[in-house]
């Protein structure tokens, strides 16, 4: 285990390198930070840190920069995540509360994360496996046409126009609405297909033709939404400091075009309130070895409805980024949990 003083030296190196993007020397560290020791002692500590793989010397005459291992230790030893100011929290809450529906919540969240962190932001729509049906509405559009609207507990809305082979009126629409909500309201989306498929056989014969048609529309809505959806913003932020990515910028952009990669990065966030940080090779994606990912889950209670996070260079402001991701996730969870 590293001595406390060497941990302080490593912390100072990370903080200075994040700010300057320049290798850090022992003299500069001693001058800028209250380490309580001479530059010579700092130099010895830096040599020890280098031997243990926490920092490296990019050029013969240059200072040191953190390695993946150094960033990892820095993050693991953070005493606390830097809290956002009251004004910042109020601004986040106000911006998100202006959303009119789920799509708007996701769009605002991903834009806000990208702006706050100046990184690439990714937000997963609420996972179907975690969502349930809040209400199903059925209304007549004409003598042979119905509108079916399915609303989830997270605000997802699916609409289907249903054509009927037999005339339909408001009384029939009301009865269909009652049957569907009695069977499905409060049930998880993943359980709904089996329930819907069995409905026509348990309904009075006069209503069966209508219910068969509407049930088919409900099933179509559920099947078509099995693929998880994500939103992304801020890819232009990667070009702010191309030196951080050397020759890997193109491969990073190509990797971000793959939804399976994005889901791998943020979809594994299963708990709310817990921020995870994956650095370099920890992303398990070859093209992203020069990046870091900060992610968390959002939702009501301990289990996440979905994940969100940011991707940027390993040389990032980890305390500030973690605070921003946690704050946005908290407010999104509260917003989606409101009745």
Curated annotation (Swiss-Prot):
Keywords: Repressor, Stress response, Transcription, Transcription regulation. GO terms for molecular function: DNA binding; DNA-binding transcription factor activity. The keyword Repressor applies. Gene3D superfamilies: 3.30.450.40, Heat-inducible transcription repressor hrca homolog, domain 3, Winged helix-like DNA-binding domain superfamily/Winged helix DNA-binding domain. It holds the Pfam family HTH_DeoR. One of its GO terms (biological process) is negative regulation of DNA-templated transcription. Coiled coil: none annotated. InterPro entries: DeoR_HTH, GAF-like_dom_sf, HrcA, HrcA_C, WH-like_DNA-bd_sf, WH_DNA-bd_sf, WHTH_transcript_rep_HrcA_IDD. The keyword Cytoplasm does not apply. Belongs to the HrcA family. Negative regulator of class I heat shock genes (grpE-dnaK-dnaJ and groELS operons). Prevents heat-shock induction of these operons. This is Heat-inducible transcription repressor HrcA. It comes from Frankia casuarinae (strain DSM 45818 / CECT 9043 / HFP020203 / CcI3).
């Amino acid at each position: 285990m590293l001595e406390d003083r060497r941990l302080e030296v490593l912390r100072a190196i990370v903080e200075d390198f994040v700010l300057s993007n320049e290798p850090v020397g022992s003299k500069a560290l001693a001058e800028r930070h209250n380490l309580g020791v001479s530059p010579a002692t700092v130099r010895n500590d830096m040599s020890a840190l280098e031997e243990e793989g926490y920092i490296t010397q990019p050029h013969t005459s240059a200072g040191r920069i953190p390695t993946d291992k150094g960033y990892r230790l820095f993050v693991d030893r953070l005493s606390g995540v830097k809290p956002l100011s009251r004004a910042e929290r109020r601004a986040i809450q106000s911006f998100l509360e202006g959303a009119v529906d789920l799509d708007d919540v996701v769009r605002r969240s991903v834009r806000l994360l990208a702006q706050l962190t100046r990184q690439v932001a990714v937000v997963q729509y609420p996972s179907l496996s975690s969502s349930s049906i809040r209400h199903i509405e059925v209304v007549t559009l004409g003598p042979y046409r119905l509108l079916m609207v399915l609303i989830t507990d997270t605000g997802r809305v699916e609409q289907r126009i249903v054509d009927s082979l037999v005339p339909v009126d408001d009384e029939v629409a009301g009865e269909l609405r009652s049957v569907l909500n009695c069977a499905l309201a409060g049930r998880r989306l993943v359980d709904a297909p089996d329930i819907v498929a069995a409905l026509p056989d348990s309904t009075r014969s006069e209503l069966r033709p209508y219910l068969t048609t509407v049930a088919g529309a409900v099933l179509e809505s559920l099947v078509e939404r099995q693929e998880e959806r994500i939103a992304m913003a801020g890819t232009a932020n990667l070009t702010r400091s191309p030196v951080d990515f050397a020759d890997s910028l193109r491969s990073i952009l190509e990797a971000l075009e793959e939804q399976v990669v994005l889901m791998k990065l943020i979809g594994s966030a299963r708990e709310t309130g817990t921020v995870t940080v994956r650095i370099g090779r920890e992303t398990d994606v070859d093209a992203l070895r020069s990046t870091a990912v900060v992610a968390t889950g959002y939702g009501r209670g301990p289990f996440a409805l979905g994940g969100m996070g940011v991707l940027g260079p390993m040389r990032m402001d980890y305390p500030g980024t973690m605070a921003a991701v946690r704050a946005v996730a908290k407010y999104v969870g509260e917003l989606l949990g409101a009745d």
